[in-house]
């Protein structure tokens, strides 16, 4: 199972049911469980990471705020943003947490490079940036040697809700998205490229795709 990956396209979902399903998957998986990546667009929501501080919520208005158990501070999820959750057995892949963070940043950088968008990671703030503007947020959690949570890549979305928070705890952090930089407006195209880069970086040899309707909305 080390080189097998299951890619599930969840479509558009509320945050909490997917978060609960990630927990259930991680709690019940064993050494034989293949790694999975879940691709989803969330309905509008602010999520606070474990390090989240209330003062970074400036004016959330009618958008709900959910306390999450991922790393990091507050961020926004909404339609037009590609969220990828990485359910990976790190011990099996012989990856440390820092290795996984670097791999995820590199797969985003490589994905954007396919669209002639130059981007980079920052040592002081996880995520991916284009000329100082943030295009991708990153937050993970590890349990039983397995990762969950993941990344949020701005593709073709309304960025204005980010003005209601200090994104990832940084006052005045400017956000940018793929479609503004000459890349695709279609999330499905970006999903394909992202999965391709992930398979290359982590050496998966068998990849199974599914449109997952069964993620339980507990």
From Swiss-Prot:
<protein>
    <recommendedName>
        <fullName>Octanoyltransferase</fullName>
        <ecNumber>2.3.1.181</ecNumber>
    </recommendedName>
</protein>
<keyword id="KW-0012">Acyltransferase</keyword>
<feature type="binding site">
    <location>
        <begin position="150"/>
        <end position="152"/>
    </location>
    <ligand>
        <name>substrate</name>
    </ligand>
</feature>
<feature type="site" description="Lowers pKa of active site Cys">
    <location>
        <position position="134"/>
    </location>
</feature>
<keyword id="KW-0963">Cytoplasm</keyword>
<dbReference type="InterPro" id="IPR045864">
    <property type="entry name" value="aa-tRNA-synth_II/BPL/LPL"/>
</dbReference>
<dbReference type="Pfam" id="PF21948">
    <property type="entry name" value="LplA-B_cat"/>
</dbReference>
<dbReference type="InterPro" id="IPR004143">
    <property type="entry name" value="BPL_LPL_catalytic"/>
</dbReference>
<dbReference type="GO" id="GO:0005737">
    <property type="term" value="C:cytoplasm"/>
</dbReference>
<feature type="binding site">
    <location>
        <begin position="70"/>
        <end position="77"/>
    </location>
    <ligand>
        <name>substrate</name>
    </ligand>
</feature>
<dbReference type="InterPro" id="IPR000544">
    <property type="entry name" value="Octanoyltransferase"/>
</dbReference>
<comment type="similarity">
    <text>Belongs to the LipB family.</text>
</comment>
<dbReference type="GO" id="GO:0036211">
    <property type="term" value="P:protein modification process"/>
</dbReference>
<feature type="binding site">
    <location>
        <begin position="137"/>
        <end position="139"/>
    </location>
    <ligand>
        <name>substrate</name>
    </ligand>
</feature>
<feature type="active site" description="Acyl-thioester intermediate">
    <location>
        <position position="168"/>
    </location>
</feature>
<keyword id="KW-0808">Transferase</keyword>
<dbReference type="InterPro" id="IPR020605">
    <property type="entry name" value="Octanoyltransferase_CS"/>
</dbReference>
<dbReference type="GO" id="GO:0033819">
    <property type="term" value="F:lipoyl(octanoyl) transferase activity"/>
</dbReference>
<comment type="function">
    <text>Catalyzes the transfer of endogenously produced octanoic acid from octanoyl-acyl-carrier-protein onto the lipoyl domains of lipoate-dependent enzymes. Lipoyl-ACP can also act as a substrate although octanoyl-ACP is likely to be the physiological substrate.</text>
</comment>
<feature type="domain" description="BPL/LPL catalytic">
    <location>
        <begin position="31"/>
        <end position="206"/>
    </location>
</feature>
<comment type="pathway">
    <text>Protein modification; protein lipoylation via endogenous pathway; protein N(6)-(lipoyl)lysine from octanoyl-[acyl-carrier-protein]: step 1/2.</text>
</comment>
């Amino acid at each position: 199972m080390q080189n097998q990956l299951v890619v599930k396209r969840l479509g558009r979902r509320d945050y909490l049911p997917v978060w609960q399903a990630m927990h259930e998957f991680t709690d019940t998986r064993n050494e034989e469980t293949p790694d999975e990546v879940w691709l989803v667009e969330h309905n509008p929501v602010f999520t606070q990471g474990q390090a989240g501080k209330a003062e970074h919520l400036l004016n959330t208005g009618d958008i709900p705020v959910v306390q999450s158990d991922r790393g990091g501070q507050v961020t926004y999820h909404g339609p037009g943003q590609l969220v990828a959750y990485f359910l990976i057995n790190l011990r099996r892949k012989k990856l440390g947490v820092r290795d996984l963070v670097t791999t995820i940043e590199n797969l985003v950088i490589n994905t954007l490079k396919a669209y002639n968008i130059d981007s980079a990671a920052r040592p002081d703030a996880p995520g991916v940036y284009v000329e100082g503007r943030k295009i991708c947020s990153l937050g993970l959690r590890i349990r039983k040697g397995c990762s969950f949570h993941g990344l949020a890549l701005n593709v073709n979305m309304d960025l204005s809700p980010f003005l209601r928070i200090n994104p990832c705890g940084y006052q005045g952090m400017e956000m940018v998205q793929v479609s503004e930089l000459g890349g695709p407006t279609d999330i499905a195209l970006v999903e394909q490229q992202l999965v391709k880069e992930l398979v290359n970086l982590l050496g998966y040899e068998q990849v199974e795709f599914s449109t997952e309707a069964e993620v339980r909305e507990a």
